[in-house]
Amino acid sequence: MFSWMGRQAGGRERAGGADAVQTVTGGLRSLYLRKVLPLEEAYRFHEFHSPALEDADFENKPMILLVGQYSTGKTTFIRYLLEQDFPGMRIGPEPTTDSFIAVMYGETEGSTPGNALVVDPKKPFRKLSRFGNAFLNRFMCSQLPNQVLKSISVIDSPGILSGEKQRISRGYDFCQVLQWFAERVDRIILLFDAHKLDISDEFSEAIKAFRGQDDKIRVVLNKADQVDTQQLMRVYGALMWSLGKVINTPEVLRVYIGSFWAQPLQNTDNRRLFEAEAQDLFRDIQSLPQKAAVRKLNDLIKRARLAKVHAYIISYLKKEMPSVFGKENKKRELISRLPEIYIQLQREYQISAGDFPEVKAMQEQLENYDFTKFHSLKPKLIEAVDNMLSNKISPLMNLISQEETSTPTQLVQGGAFDGTTEGPFNQGYGEGAKEGADEEEWVVAKDKPVYDELFYTLSPINGKISGVNAKKEMVTSKLPNSVLGKIWKLADCDCDGMLDEEEFALAKHLIKIKLDGYELPSSLPPHLVPPSHRKSLPKAD
């Protein structure tokens, strides 16, 4: 479907002009190079916000960034997904991972140090060289032949400690590095330890570095088997309260609760919850290859909007600067007035406040620049980006839909993702409507004597009870009529508007399934069909 799935990006263009492209990846790259990049270069966007995008940024596989305090289980989580050790992996209760490790697919197992990694044009890490040797000495790529890594890559980050000394001693701007990765990954997973929940100051700053990437963030409350149900409720509440103070978004973040390692659960009270949460998280990760093109398109749109706003800010500062005297005083005045300038530009160009960069960070950066060397506003560059946003995005969305339709669904496979897809350990196997699927005896038979007693109190005529009498008993379940109507439709196998004793027992069994919290089947599974109705049941078309 996309270039990183084996199909060549770019390719031949269709007839219809330079804007017609053959692949989504080629279209995104072309739009960026022709429409957005000239605007970025004219107003020093790369110095203020983010380095220029390269081919590898458009062609790389979906990436997941793991962030958390030390010993929350980040490296163990990767080991759990891959079901395999990887080069550079260190696990322990003390702070172990002191480097950023990009875990990627490779035909042979090995590792590449950061300085060599940032000169490889095939890897999307070349722009990390701007963080210097202090960072590059703490960055490596771990490659291994693993089925999971054929579809995704994972970035393991150093465990975050509390304290100012640890932050300073890194030798590089940790939050800036996280922000760089956040702009390029498909999913950001924040890991918390349910047994020792804490959000340090540096972790808070790290989370704030993800501003504008809220849609990518997922939260994992790990090691939840180490606390009982009552404690887990308190921990979950405390986590949501703490996150609410750090992440400024009205939407509630999705939190996955579980124990993500291949060891026995210490507390099995919530086993069913943990399994359901793990499957939800797996489905979210498995969907990343399908959504990668949409994510890249969304990131390009966000980048283009920010580049436009940046151009308005820089050109305004240039326009306000005097030509001869008082330049430094005017510069200080403009920097202090930046919040007012933001409001003025919002009104003048009808731009949302959410498109503007953070005021404080922008003020700090502007201190280092000579405003007289900024460029005045170039309307043609702005018009090119506006034209892209208005007219060029829609065809790409259509192309994404076409590629998804023409190409089989690609899901992440291998590792932990294969452990619950087949056999009795598949989620929901032998539960709810699936109970008794591999048994010879009719599963309803074990409770049928109880149901028969009820049946004969409902005045059966010729071995059947009417819909009116059946309703009197079924409504005692307090289920809504819409659900009871579906149960009636499933239980009335011969569609005669009445229930015999087996059909009534089936209806009571389906009610029990629903009351236990399981979903009803859309059609009656063969193993639930009453024995006396199995030959007469009409075959599905």
Swiss-Prot record:
Domain called Dynamin-type G: residue spans: 58-289
Please list the residue ranges annotated as the EF-hand domain. Answer: 479-514
Q: In which tissues is it expressed?
A: Highly expressed in pancreas and heart.
Instruction: Cite the SUPFAM superfamilies for this sequence.
Output: EF-hand, P-loop containing nucleoside triphosphate hydrolases
Q: Which Gene3D superfamilies match?
A: 1.10.268.20, EF-hand, P-loop containing nucleotide triphosphate hydrolases
Name of this protein: EH domain-containing protein 4
Tell me what gene encodes this: EHD4
Modified-residue entries (N-acetylmethionine), positions = M1
Q: Which UniProt keywords apply?
A: Acetylation, ATP-binding, Calcium, Cell junction, Cell membrane, Endosome, Membrane, Metal-binding, Nucleotide-binding, Phosphoprotein
**Which residues are annotated with the PTM Phosphotyrosine?**
Y451
Q: Where is the EH domain?
A: 447-535
UniProt remark on domains = The EH domain interacts with Asn-Pro-Phe (NPF) motifs of target proteins.
Stored CDD domains: EH, EHD
Family statement drawn from the similarity comment of this UniProt entry: Belongs to the TRAFAC class dynamin-like GTPase superfamily. Dynamin/Fzo/YdjA family. EHD subfamily.
Q: How does it assemble?
A: Homooligomer, and heterooligomer with EHD1, EHD2 and EHD3. Forms a complex with EHD4 and MICALL1; the complex controls CDH5 trafficking and coordinates angiogenesis.
What is its biological role? ATP- and membrane-binding protein that probably controls membrane reorganization/tubulation upon ATP hydrolysis. Plays a role in early endosomal transport. During sprouting angiogenesis, in complex with PACSIN2 and MICALL1, forms recycling endosome-like tubular structure at asymmetric adherens junctions to control CDH5 trafficking.
Name the positions where Ca(2+) binds.
D492, D494, D496, M498, E503
Question: What residue spans carry the region label G1 motif?
Answer: 68-75
List of residues binding ATP: G68, Q69, Y70, S71, T72, G73, K74, T75, K223, W261
How does this protein lie in the membrane? Peripheral membrane protein
Please name the GO terms that the record assigns under molecular function: ATP binding; cadherin binding; calcium ion binding; GTP binding; nucleic acid binding; protein-macromolecule adaptor activity
- Which residues lie within the region annotated G5 motif? 246
| InterPro entries, per the entry | DUF5600 (IPR040990), Dynamin_N (IPR045063), EF-hand-dom_pair (IPR011992), EF_Hand_1_Ca_BS (IPR018247), EF_hand_dom (IPR002048), EH_dom (IPR000261), EHD_N (IPR031692), G_DYNAMIN_dom (IPR030381)
